[in-house]
């Protein structure tokens, strides 16, 4: 394998990160490839300097505080159209109830939310409105402008605000590359270009979780539901619009 630059993949859920992790398993030797950093307790006391590829569901601000060589790494991520992203994330957690082995390995707080989501008809405006009006706890942290949260790391109990949005856009502008899920293949090729990887690489694999059954279909044809969900995507939308209108590479 060719020597590649040290990288950190900021793995925002439901943005094709499983595919990217699988790709880099082929590019980086096993002993220098580490995924799912969120599963490691006491990260502050660990040394990751020997790892070429780091990936995890860890907000960027937190990663920069606990990984000592973060300034030496190329950092990239993928973002997604916010309504589609929100619905995919809600659906993924809800669908855990249909797969007992996967359901059982998740923390109780996730199981509790999955069971709650399973009782909601997300095509029913009144039920969705009731859910949004009462959202708190883990559901707030999981669904409130989750992509902005992955940059700025606000408290789980705190709603995001316009200051978080501005900070997230500023942080995103400073990392090596921000890819777009809706332009996935081109974004992956651009990541490889930023890393100076010129190998003959196949991108034929299917996206992980691509069969995730959605709780709402054709959201953009349902203006009333979009209006109800808007508080959960308003700042993510500003972040997304910023990067679909600009050159996505900051290299």
Please place each PLM-identified region on the residue numbering.
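A cross-family signal for N-terminal binding/gating loops and helix N-caps
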Residues: 2-66, 78
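Short hydrophobic "helix-edge" motifs at membrane interfaces and signal-peptide entry regions
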Residues: 5-7, 70-72, 226
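A residue-level signal for conserved active-site and pocket-lining positions in enzyme catalytic cores
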Residues: 16, 81, 179, 191, ...
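Non-transmembrane alpha-helical segments in soluble domains
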Residues: 21-25, 83, 87, 188-192, ...
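PAPS-dependent sulfotransferase catalytic domain
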Residues: 40-52, 56-77, 84-200
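PAPS-dependent sulfotransferase catalytic core
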Residues: 53-64, 166, 200-250
